[in-house]
Regions:
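Rieske [2Fe-2S] iron-sulfur-binding domain
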Residues: 13-107, 111
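Short coil-to-beta-strand transition motifs
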Residues: 2-4, 87-88
Length: 112
């Protein structure tokens, strides 16, 4: 596995169209399965801290809506669709031998 990636969960444990909140290296991370592709975001909505891993996933749009007030985020990038300029961090994800790995060391968008 590439450096800085940590095991998150078994891919089979997260069905398509669902999200789950996990803790990696002391951080709450929302992991999503969208049509067999896995993504990870910082779990807290910037509005009121709602758990995005418990939000409503729209697979066709690749978005998640916060379960508290419905703010919508792009699952791939973390961009906030409802309130531009209020993104959440997106993390790089790898799928290796049926396991989802997440790097909390760098951002998916910047690679840093």
């Amino acid at each position: 596995m590439p450096e800085n990636f940590l095991p998150a969960l078994d891919a089979a444990a997260l069905p398509p169209g669902k999200g789950e909140t996990i803790e990696i290296a002391g951080q709450r991370i929302a992991v999503f399965n969208v049509g067999g592709e896995f993504y990870a975001l910082h779990d807290a909505c910037p509005h009121r801290g709602g758990p995005l891993g418990s939000g409503w996933v729209e697979g066709e749009k690749c978005t998640v809506a916060c379960p508290l007030h419905g703010w919508e985020f792009d699952i791939k990038t973390g961009a906030c669709i409802s309130m531009p300029g209020r993104p959440v961090r997106a993390y790089p994800v790898r799928l290796v031998e049926g396991k989802v790995w997440v790097s909390v060391q760098q951002s998916a968008a910047s690679g840093q």
